[in-house]
Amino acid sequence: KYLGGSSANIAFGTARLGLKSAMLSRVGDDHMGRFLVESLAREGCDVSAIQVDPQRLTAMVLLGLKDRETFPLVFYRENCADMALSAEDINEAFIASSKALLITGTHFSTDGVYRASLQALDYAQKHGVKRVLDIDYRPVLWGLAGKADGETRFVADHQVSQHVQSILPRFDLIVGTEEEFLIAGGSADLLTALRTVRSLSAATLVVKLGPQGCTVIHGEIPPRLEDGAIYPGVRVEVLNVLGAGDAFMSGFLSGWLEDASDERCCQLANACGGLVVSRHACAPAMPTRAELDYLFSSPVPITRPDQDPVLQRLHQVSVPRKAWKQLFVFAFDHRGQLVELAQQGGQDPTRISALKQLFIQAVERVEQLLREQGVAADVGLLADQRFGQDALNAATGRGWWVARPVEVQGSRPLAFEHGRSVGSNLIAWPQEQIIKCLVQYHPDDEPLLRLEQEAQIRGLYQASQVSGHELLLEIIPPKDLPGAHPEVLYRSLKRLYNLGIYPAWWKIEAQSAEEWQ
C-alpha cells in the first residue's frame, strides 16, 4: 500500500523537495488513516491540521497496471473522512501562516467540502496567501462515470464546467492537463477553453502536455500553444502514470514558491513527473533534490531511471530515514546454538520460542529503565523467524529497531533459509523490519567461492531495493584464511562497495581508534 490522494501526494512531494508543507484534511480512526498521517509526518510534512473522524473511514483506491496506457482505478470514497471536511475545520491562523494554499478540483465536487474550500480561499485572500488550483478532474468523483470506472479521465459536462468556472477567479495559479482545461473552459477546443478560463481569471496557467512537456501562459492566450514556450518533458519508459501530475505539481511549486523562472519551474516539474511514471509507486516514488541534480547533470539522457544504479541509490539514501538515537540492541537470533543447549539439557527445542518471548520482556524492561534514567536511546533486537516469530510479532509496531536473519547459519557459500528466491519471502515482512545477513567472506577466497558469495549478496541487495526493506550485512572473515583482521575487513567492505552493494547497516567487530582511522 502507498500513501495516496492528490493533495496528500503533493504535500508529500513538496516536503521531499525541501518545502515546508502541511496537510489540512481528515482521516478515519483506522489503520489506513494512521498510516497516512505517519507517512506524511515521516517525510517532514506538518500533520497538525489533520483531524481524525471517528464516524468515517479513510478513503482508498485500488490501482491496476495493465500496460503503458491502461491503469484501471476503483475509488472507495463514498462518505469517506476527507470529503467530510467542513468549513468549521478551517483555521484562519493556520491558513494565514502559509505562503501558498493548494486545493485540488475534487474538493469542489460536494457541498460540504466545497464550502470548506471556499472558507480556506477567503482566509488566504484576506492574508495575502497565494492560491493554487490543481484542476485534477476525475469524472467518477463528480458522478459522471460508473462507480468502478476511475480510469476515465474526461467526460464533458456543462454543469461541472459552470461549477469549476465559478471558482476560477479566486486563484493565482491554475494547473491542469489539456483535458482538464477543456472541462474548466467548457469547450471541446483547447484554445477556446483557455480563452474562457482567461476571461474569468488572471491567474498564471500551466498546461500539461504529457510527454511533450508543458507550457506556461501569463497573459493573453496565443493563437497557437506553439507560439509560446513549450518546455520539453523527460523521456522515460512509462510504468505507472498515477501520481505523475502530483509529482509535476510538487516540482513546479518547488520552483514557483522560490520565484524561479518559468523554465526552471517547468524543468523541475517535468523531471519529477518523469521520474514518478518510471517507478511503480506514487508518493514513495517522488524524487529528492539530490535525484533531480543527478538527472540534470547527466551527460546522456536517462530513459530508464528504474535501472540506473546511481539514481536508485540516491532514491534510497536521500529520502528521510528514521533518526535513531544511540541503540541498545539485544541479539537473540541464534538458532543452532540454542538447539544444542536444549539437547544438552534434555529439553524440547520447541521451548526456545517461549524463551525468546521472555527476551522481549527483557527489552521492555531495558527500555523502561532508560526512560526512567533520562537516557536518550532506542532499543532493538535481532530475532529469527524459526524460533522467534512470536517475538518478532510482539516487537513490531513499537518503534523498536527490529532485524531478522535470512542466512542459513554457518553456510559458506552463503545460502538463504527459504531458498534462492529471498525476495518472495520478503513480501510477507513488515516494512519496518530490517534484513540481516551474516556472511563469512574474504576478498582472497577461492575465485569460484567468492563469485558465488558475491552473487548471493548482490541478489539479496537487489531484493531489498525492490521490497523497500533496509539491509544489514554482517561480515565475518573466515578463520581458515590468513591476514590481519582489520585489513581484511577493510578490503571486504571496499570490494562490496565496488560491486555496487550499499547496505543501510554494517555489523562488524569493534575496532580500535587507530584501526578506524
Which residues does each PLM region occupy?
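Alpha/beta enzyme core
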Residues: 361, 368, 420-434, 442-443, ...
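Short, acidic/polar
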Residues: 85-90, 158-164, 414-428, 488-496
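Conserved, mostly hydrophobic/aromatic
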Residues: 330, 474, 506
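Conserved phosphate-binding/catalytic region of the ribokinase-like
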Residues: 122-126, 159, 186-309
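Conserved beta-alpha-beta core of the PfkB/ribokinase-like small-molecule kinase fold
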Residues: 100-196, 203, 211-220, 475, ...
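Alpha/beta catalytic barrel-like cores
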Residues: 302-445
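Conserved N-terminal subdomain of the carbohydrate kinase-like
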Residues: 20-105, 293-302
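Alpha-helix C-terminal capping segments
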Residues: 9-20, 63-65, 255-258
